[in-house]
Regions:
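Intrinsic disorder/low-complexity detector
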Residues: 1-7, 22, 45, 49-85, ...
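Residue-level signal for functionally critical sites in structured catalytic/ligand-binding pockets
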Residues: 12-16, 26, 40, 44, ...
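A short, charged, amphipathic alpha-helix used as a generic interaction element across diverse proteins
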Residues: 35-51, 107-122
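Short, solvent-exposed interaction modules
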Residues: 57-123
Length: 156
């Protein structure tokens, strides 16, 4: 399985609110790319059909997500810091290493359930250190380039 390189992209644009007024907003998206340049190009490509008028990519930063658990019914993204617990064979002491995971869910309880389901079969013990809702609006995974109608989907 290929390792994903996730980049958090901030996009600033004018959005029409529910009451009909326009307001400048900055939204956060996650993009799978090989470099900062590719991440910027990908977010421009993904956002162009959805934004009328001008928009600006104001920031691109690398995000160190090791796992992603997708729930098609979820409309929010949660970031979990999970501590993987291993035993040091020499000293016999417990060793904890942090891993950042992104979970799609409809609410906090579902995020915990989705994380637990995703971690089933994990060889080492683990515990949730933190779990919080993110401001990520959407995730754009790897795009299949061999089809003209290829769609970006979150990596599974």
């Amino acid at each position: 399985m290929a390792m994903n390189n996730w980049y958090e992209c901030r996009v600033k644009f004018e959005k029409v609110l529910e009451n009909g007024t326009q307001k400048k907003v900055t939204e956060v998206y996650l993009v799978d790319a090989m470099s900062f340049t590719e991440a910027e190009n990908r977010i421009i490509e993904e956002m162009t059909p959805y934004i009328s008028g001008e928009f600006e990519v104001t920031a691109v930063k690398k995000d160190r997500i090791s796992e992603m658990f997708i729930d098609p019914d979820g409309d929010k993204w949660y970031r979990a810091k999970v501590m993987l617990i291993t035993l040091d064979e020499k000293s016999g002491a417990e060793k904890k290493s942090a891993s950042i995971m992104l979970i799609q869910a409809k609410d906090f309880q579902t995020a915990i359930k989705n994380l637990e389901n995703g971690m089933k079969g994990t060889m080492s013990d683990w515990e949730i250190n933190t779990l919080s809702e993110t401001v990520i609006m959407d995730v754009y995974g790897v795009v299949a380039r061999d089809s003209s109608e290829a769609e970006a989907k979150p990596a599974e």
